[in-house]
From Swiss-Prot:
Species of the source: Fibrobacter succinogenes (strain ATCC 19169 / S85)
EC primary class: ligase
This protein's UniProt keywords: ATP-binding, Biotin biosynthesis, Ligase, Magnesium, Nucleotide-binding
Gene of this entry: bioW
Sequence similarity: Belongs to the BioW family.
Protein name: 6-carboxyhexanoate--CoA ligase
Length: 260
């Protein structure tokens, strides 16, 4: 069976003159069978046209054929939930989960990644706010490894296995668990830290092969449009090029099991 990769990106013009730039409004992607292509594309456009961030000035929909033999099927990460009272507590919980993973890798070399990341966490997260993709942060050196610091690194070509949804509503959980599962399986990946940029969604997560997918129910204030994603990577385990190649080009379907 052949599949089709469908990608939608929507943006709007912001500012005037030299300060004019494109601001991301909405994005979505799916991998579906031929019979679902038309309906899913229509749903993606509806989603872009009805976003809380406003009306888009530009919508791009890309359709690409994908051979079944090129697809890797992964079982979704196990899911746990962490309830918190404040977003500050949520960020502390997230770091508390990441720190042991960093410490384990410190023992393998002269890396003070955990300490550096704790000191820089807030600054790193703020740096991701205007980025279109994720930050790729090397825990071995403390350096950012994205080829384009504005664009960042995007994990693409992924969907849930057997997914038949065609409506335009965003399913935050499904989209996040699919992305987190693919990212966790990338060469050299240690963990992922994510806060949604949706002003109406305050849940974030930390994910890795060791932790699974940990939903932290409050990571920012309601109405805050800022959000970002950091991929914590270990350059002693794989090259940045190998990791980015997997994230951006490998086709993946995720068998989503359970929800918390």
């Amino acid at each position: 069976m052949d599949y089709y990769s469908l990608k939608m990106r929507a943006s709007q013009h912001v500012g005037e003159g030299e300060n004019s730039h494109e601001q991301h409004i909405s994005g979505a992607e799916r991998i579906v069978g031929r019979d679902s292509v038309e309906a899913v594309c229509a749903a993606m456009v509806r989603r872009a046209m009805n976003h809380s961030k406003g009306d888009p000035d530009f919508i791009n929909v890309k359709i690409e054929k994908v051979h079944e033999s090129d697809i890797q099927v992964l079982k979704s990460l196990p899911v746990t939930r962490v309830d918190v009272e404040t977003w500050q507590e949520g960020l502390e919980k997230a770091f508390g989960l990441i720190t042991p993973l960093m410490a384990l890798r410190q023992a393998q070399g002269p890396c003070d990644g955990a300490k550096k990341f704790k000191e820089k966490l807030q600054d790193l997260l703020r740096e991701t706010f205007p980025m279109r993709g994720a930050m790729l942060y090397d825990i071995a050196t403390g350096n950012r490894l994205e080829p384009d610091k504005d664009r960042g690194v995007r994990a693409t070509y992924m969907d849930a296995l057997h997914s038949s949804e065609v409506d335009g509503c965003k399913n935050h959980f499904n989209e996040a668990i699919v992305l987190a599962t693919k990212v966790a399986n990338a060469p050299g990946m240690v963990a992922e830290f994510c806060v949604s940029d949706d002003p109406n969604y305050v849940t974030g997560y930390v994910a890795s092969k060791e932790l699974g997918y940990v939903r932290i129910m409050k990571m920012k204030e309601m109405g805050d449009e800022n959000g970002g994603r950091i991929f914590l990577f270990d350059s002693r385990k794989a090259s940045a090029e190998e990791c980015i190649e997997y994230l951006q080009k490998k086709k993946v379907l995720v068998d989503v099991v359970g929800r918390t």
